[in-house]
Amino acid sequence: MSSLSDQLAQVAASNASVAFDRKKRQKLHSASLIYNPKTAATQDYETIFENALGALQELCDIEPRFQVFSKTLFSETSITIDRNVQSKEENKNLDNAINAYLLMVSSKWHLAPALHATEWLVRRFQIHVHNTEILLLSTLNYYQSPIFKRILNIVKLPALFQPLSNFVKNDSNPTNITIIKMFNDTDFLKLYSNYLSKCIKHKSTYTNQLLFVTCCFINLIAFNSSNDEKLEFLVPIILEIAAKLLASGSTDCQIAAHTILIVFTAALPLKKDIVVAAIETILANLKDKKAEQSAFWAVIKISQTLKGQQAIEHLPANIYKIFDKHYTWVRVLDLLTEEPSIKCDKFMTSYIRAMIRFDHSKLDMVVPLVQKLSLEKYEFRSIVIDLIHLSEVLEDKSKLIDLFEFLVKENESLVINCLSSLNLTGEMFEIRLTTSLFSKTNDDNELELLKTLNSHKNTSSDKKEETKPFKQFLEENSEFIVTSNKSMISEDDEKFNKILGLFIEAIGTGYQAGLFLSSFMTTLEARLTFLLRVIVSPSAPIALRLLAMNNISKYIQSIDKELNLFTLIPFLLVAQSGSSKNLKISVKKILGQIGNRPFTKHYFMSNQLYGEGKDIKVPSPSDSEMWTKNFIENYVVENVDISGVFIPKQAEKVFLLFWAQQVLDIPLPYPQYMILNFLGKYVPNTASYSGLFEESISSYLERREELLLRCALNKTDPIQFETAMVNLISNKEKHHFMLDFIINVLQSDYEDLIQILVDRLVEVFATFKTSNQLRIVQEILQSVTKEDQIYDALGTLQSLQIDPDTFVCIFKENSINSESDVTSFPKRRRRRSSTNKAALQSAEVSQIAEDHLKKLTIMLETLDKQKVKGSEELLSSLFFTLADFETLDQDGGLPVLYAEELLASAMLNTIRSLKDQGLTQLQNVRADIIVSAIRTSSSPQVQNKLLLVIGELATLSSEIVLHSVMPIFTFMGAHSVRQDDEFTTQVVEKTILTVVPAFLAANSENITEEIEFLVMSFATALQHIPKHRRLRLFTTLVQALGSDNSLGPLLLLISQQYSNAVKSFKISESRSLVEFTKLLLSKFEVQEQITGFRKFLELYEKLLLANKNPEKKVTLETQALFSSKILNLTQSEFCDLTNNSYDFLTKVIVDTNDDYYDSSRNFKIRLYSIILDPTVSNATRKALDESYSSVLKMILSLIADYPDIFVFETNENSEKQNSVHFIGDILEEIKQSLYGLLHAILDVLPINVFLTTTVPLLESSIDKEIRYHIASNIFDKFENETVDDHELTQSVVHTLNEKIPQEENNVAQVLLNLQSSLINKYGSFFDNNLLVEVLNLASGLISTGPRELQISSIAVITNCVSVMGVKFISFYPKVVPICIKLFNETRASKEELAPQLQLSILLLFTALVKSIPSFLTSDLISLMKLIFFSSGVEVTTRLSVIQLVTEKLDLKNVLGTLLKVWNSEVKESGDSTAISLFLSLLEGTVEKIEKKSATSQSPLFFKLLICLFEFRSQSEFDTNTISRIESSVYAVANTYVLKLNDKVFRPLFVILIKWAFDGEGVSSESITEKERLTAFFKFFNRLQENLKGIITSYFTYLIEPVNELLKRFISGDISDVNLRRLLLNSLTSSLKYDRDEYWQSTSRFELICPSLVNQLSNIEPTIGKYLVKAIGSLAAKNSSVDEHNQMMNKLLVEHMKATCSSNEKLWAVRTVKLIYSKVGESWLVLLPQMVPIIAELLEDDNEEVESEVRGGLVRVMENVLGEPFDRYLD
């Protein structure tokens, strides 16, 4: 039985869509996949259904299977279906239909119709409530799409989907890691696996879903990759899913299964039986060819996970058959070729082993398979051993020959080891296979086997049947019996091979060799020639050859002694070439036999040996004897190389020709190859004998197939054979037939032969004549144009050592333009002709042009790689080729960029090679071709390389500089410098550094104009050059051109760009131009920079004069630097340009914060370092002084001549729009810019040089405005810099003393300011007399001078006071009274300079306070007035002076003066600022005054305090302002009181009480009693807050006056809410801070209690709470005294009677409530007296009173009583 919670959950689920109220129904109805809730809530079912029906029809058009739902879920009756009233069975059917629909629609969620159709199921059947799981599962693979986020928003997530809840809250799509975590949940994984199984079963899987499933499983495996336990748990789940996917028949499903299995087995290697089962399942279910590749690699990769020997066991027969059914061996090879990087050795080893075991018909497939694989050693060994075992049982062993030849070639040692492990030797195995296999021989094994063979024992240990008789063997093979004396050397290869096979078989069977030979060859000649052929046959095993040697030795003895056996020598020589020592010994033995015979003229078989009628050209008997004996004597068995004894020196030529002829005569390829090798080793240069091979070589290609077939039949390597033939090509080859052979081979389709030829050509090509080289190269180039090239023509050419002349010939022969088109130097580059263009449009001609381009490109690649020695002819041909490329590009539209880049590289290499050879001059270089190519090329790389060519040519040909530099630099400025790459930058720099020096040297007469043109070319492109590359480029340019001539023009051009940027409000661009210019100038010496400034000013002066004078403008128009645009500017535009340019130069010179941290770009620091460096020579200093002076003079001249220079000729047409005022403003700006430039130029000088330069400029002969600015510059200089030479500053002050009286007011003011600054900074070092002189001058000026001079003079006096101190006292009467007078004059004045004058006077008094405070006592009132009423001075400044006053002056005097100033000035002023400053000074004084002084001055202070209290009645300020003032006064008073003791303060407090209550000591008749009492109680309350219980006893002086005042409030004699509140608060505070039972005194209590409680009778509602608090505090303090409690209770009851007013009763109730809440326990005894009153109040007519009693008082009493109050009422 299920638990109660489960039952409740089921009920809740079934009723999830049941809504019992309107809101819930609306919420259910508003859940939508498409619409927002508000819109969805307004829709009816009919509208939703109609929309869904249309969507379903669209789905049916896509997938007809949806039609079934039109009769169920989307039928007309579905509108009326309500699952809440249906039966359980009906709902089950409905859910099944919905689930089926969701399975089908899951692949269509990306389509709008699916969304609109499903909307009906959500709205009508609430599938988001009842079918949540299937809805989420079917859409989970869309988790990153908006639709899934929408579904999450409307469903209630089941428990297994809870990880998605966070994304519902955040309204975002789930992340990948969340999905992984969900799948990592075991329950969810099983749930989704079941769902996937349903999808597979119903064939509703689709690509997107399978991709999602695959990714999820892969991520799940990766997530648990380090958790083996989890992976083990996943095994059955994943295998089950994979099996179902594989069994589905869907290609996508199978590919998904393959992928999952690959990843899973890689993470967790499975047992072999599982792997085998998985492979069988994969292959068994493979039906669609689309899945074949995936299945193949799945099988491969799953097998790779197996470990150990079991991994390579042969495949089971059933799996092999299935695999073989799906994959032919050709298909397997193709798949392995497609993915060569994938390891597949384990499965393929198993597959090969299965093939060896089960399918012998496919043994031919083993070799190509093994070639494709990278097998481990143990895998290779397994295959070899299987094949060795197979050789025992396989009848047709010829199938294994090629296979074992390959295996031996791959790893001979391993094969031999495998044989040894099976107790077999290589020699025995060769006999078994009837072929020769091994190059490594074992001499002992050979001899042992030979003995065995000679002893006629059976060598075949594997024979199980009895050997058949030889006679039977002979009869079976009687057709191969030879009865003639014909030579077997010339016998047909197939017949010989058959006889050889029979011979091996016979020997292997155990028949006697002699028996076989005599039986199958009846003549001696046949037997001997057969054996000779055996010993030179590569297919014959070593043991057989040894046996043949023995028999040859025997047969020789049977030959007539008169026959010369020298004809056998070639075969013996070839036979000894192997590695077998025994074979060599046998050869030497036979040679000995031959040498012991007579050397007659009758040679054995001389006309039969190589064929009937073929005479053998043999040496004379004497030569043959000499050769034989020489060879035997010098032949060493251990020697591998016999070339040293191959041809004797005595008859070298004879035997050289003899052996060469043998190659031609012997009809066997292997001996031919071996003899050629012997010849090649002896004579590397084959020219001496290669002529003999003319016929053979000439016909070689025709006979090649026949020769290669013979090689195959004789088991001769065709590559080695052809290599030997090709090696006949000699160094310096001259034979035409050989050259024809080379050409014919290159034209052939024989790739292997061509490669052999190429390898030989690489060795000998360099020795060929140029004509022969040219012929070969032309042929190779011709093959380039073929679509299907047999060999790598480019690689071939690049590997050949081609000489420069050959390249020249090639380029000339492949030229399009005739030399007459391009060699006529005075002509410019020909233009593109329409004729060429039309011709190249032809398809045939176009193809020829493409082939031509391809050839040239190949040659250029070759030339670029080989780096051949350069020559002028080669360079010239490259120029012609460049012209051809331009024709192909411009006229033919062919892609020549790559070829041009190669050509440029080749030209560079050639030029550099010529330079290395010492060449210094080139003639007739066509620079215009390069320039044209640069201009027309669209490739920056080509352009850059051609620019490098220009640079390299610059030093070898002045012609290029003279005729081409301008277009080159124009191009660089327009294009190259704009490229943002390092290579282009380096190219441009290198071009500049190489071309410019040559250019300057060639144009010494007109150098300035040319320099300006080049600078303009680059400066014009400045804004287009990447910012990080500008500096290096322009630095290189200026250095190359020379800074003296180029820096000024460059500054001029940059200043124009700066002006344009400023006018266009491009602030960042203008700032970057200034920064760039600074950085550029920092790369040059200071002298160079100053020269550049001078040139800049000179150029602008020319512009100014040209704008003024039309004749000079015409002159400038010829200069490249002054474009017509600048010269034709309107007057206002030119003024703007001039102003901005001067401003630009100023900013360049002036240092900024960035310059502070980088001294290299700080012009000022670098100038200092030269001027102040003692190591700098005088000549350098002098040159610098002259340059700097010239710049300064030019600026001063411009300023002085300003009115004349800046009067322009007005062009009426262009100046109509410019008003006179506008031009005047611009001219004024120019003037100020010039002054700014002057200031910048002067400011960078060291102070001593600066003064030496500027002081003379103050002479009166100079314009006063200039003097003014010079004086300002001097002032700024001293302000910003420190001077160590104090004599210098004194002299300056002295000079100023003399100059000031003579100057105009504005200049004199600046000089006075300068004097003030100097005295402030260096006055302490000045002589006292000098300061007296200054004071005399200044004191005179303050009384007689104008205001500005008065201000500056006072500043001078102020600084003198600071320096002189008390010594100033003699000037005190002269200065201070006048300053006070000046202040009084300006106090009410509205002069413009009044604030500055007030400030200067205030600062003077500040200095006096600091320096001579004691002398200021008499003028203290004036000082305070100055502080309080200097309205033009900032308040903060005056506050600082106040602080200084409180620190420096005697505070007793200050306090007395404050009282006087208050009464005399401040209180009557009505100036809030003055009052605020007065209070600040008072506060500061009180805070800093000592207690002793405070005690002595306390009467004075309290007198001032009373005056301040009375200010309320005298002021016209608003109440808030007065309150703030009084608050400050109370704070000050409290601070002062804290400095007094009780003995001093009590009398003063009594005075205050009498003033407040009795009016004693009142100084203002206008103040009222209420105001006095208000002021007092505010002060007293603040005092109580600060002093707390210390002054509780002081209430003794107040208790009676307060009692009287309370009574007056009761009687109504006085009425003031604020005063009453203050009074009540004072009582509360006193009660609060009472720590000495002061208020428990009966006398005080009985005095104050009635008056206080009776306040209830007429208390104002606004302050009732203060009264309640006061009474409550009094009750709390006296709660321990019963009599006091009774008294207060009685008084309170009187105010709670029915006859009392409602307000009175209300506050009385609240008071009682507060008392009971505080001290209820003490008042419980009084409760019976209170009950009747409370009962009455509970029935009170006033609701507020009743509510307060019922809700407040009664509840408080109940809390105290601990029981309901109703009990007392009952």
From Swiss-Prot:
Start-end of each HEAT repeat: 1730-1768
GO BP, one annotated term: positive regulation of transcription by RNA polymerase I
Stored InterPro entries: ARM-like, ARM-type_fold, BP28_C_dom, HEAT_type_2, HEAT_Utp10/HEAT1, U3snoRNP10_N, UTP10
Nucleotide-binding recorded as keyword: no
UniProt subcellular location: Nucleus, Nucleolus; Membrane
Key words, A-Z: Membrane, Nucleus, Repeat, Ribonucleoprotein, Ribosome biogenesis, rRNA processing, Transmembrane, Transmembrane helix
SUPFAM superfamilies: ARM repeat
Domain of life: Eukaryota
Membrane spanning residue stretches: 499-519, 528-548
Single GO MF annotation: U3 snoRNA binding
One GO cellular component term noted in the UniProt record for this chain: preribosome, small subunit precursor
Entry membrane topology: Multi-pass membrane protein
Primary location class: nucleus
Protein task: Involved in nucleolar processing of pre-18S ribosomal RNA. Involved in ribosome biosynthesis.
Family the UniProt entry places it in: Belongs to the HEATR1/UTP10 family.
Subunit structure: Component of the ribosomal small subunit (SSU) processome.
Protein name per Swiss-Prot or TrEMBL: U3 small nucleolar RNA-associated protein 10
Gene: UTP10
